[in-house]
Amino acid sequence: MNFIFKKVLFLLPIIILSSCNEVTSTSNNSTKLDLPKMPTLVDNRSNDKKMKTITTLNGNEVTYNANTRDIVALGCAGDILSLGLRPLAVDGNTNSNGYENYFYGVEKLKNTQPFDPEEVLSYKPELILTYDTMDQKDITKLEKIAPVIPIYFNTYDYEKRISYLGNIFDMKDNSDILISFCHELEEKSLASLEKLGFKNKTVTVFSYMNGICIPPDFNGAFVFNHILYDVLNLNKNEKVEQYLNNQAQPAYSPISSEKLKEYEGDINIYASMDETDNSIPDVVKTNEGWKSLKCVKGNKVGVINIVLFSLKDVLYMANQYQSIFNAIEVTL
């Protein structure tokens, strides 16, 4: 089940802990960098029916109305909405907080494990979009309701994801604009990092789960790992590399207070798991190992919210990059 990791994140027993005032980093309280704004695209397709046949990612031929607005999307809602489309309903786990304009008139499915056929049917869709790793047996169930097209889900290649969506709906102009935005965002972010003097530095993202730990990055988990290490080309120190590559240990394995210093990077960020609180909890601040870190003594720990980084979709990219740079600026 490809949404399991995402669901685990939201179902984790997060302890809401009181904390003192802390230097935090959200997109609302730090200096804005010269990063591009997310373009607002509209759906300019005709209302006339336009039948089209394509071969899907799983090799099936599907005939559908390429101009339909009657769509139910079981995955990748952020990419779909970014393109200018407004489905009837989308995956209920999609993050809409702060993106209400995109979700106006769009309902969220209540049943997402992986779906309730009756609920999907209730929307009377002409087309169903789903993630490309859905089991064929589930796709077969959906095909009894409407044509089904799997779309790219489990990849950071936004060009592949967005161009494929643009091809499905003949919205190449919109997909080209969106891809250009993503390219510009990456390029300007790299340039901004160099201006801050952090090129080739090491970065460590700490969090708390039954102990101070480092969030996993296997199977593309958490977008901040991709941005920091793959796009911005920052590095992990040797101990962080060993920790993240150790598949034998459980995710979020606690790091002992005595060894925590060994994981400190040139840049250090704390990933808050509390959706409503971007501060470092007391259970972390009172940890002797944490208090011994140079970055903590110098009050140079940036904070991000881990929930923002649970989805790869283009809709969230601008805020994800801004949040990371706000956190990095705290460490200056």
Please identify what each model-predicted range represents:
Residues 46, 264-332:
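Structured C-terminal subdomain patch of bacterial secreted/periplasmic proteins
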Residues 1-9:
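Bacterial N-terminal signal peptides that target proteins for export
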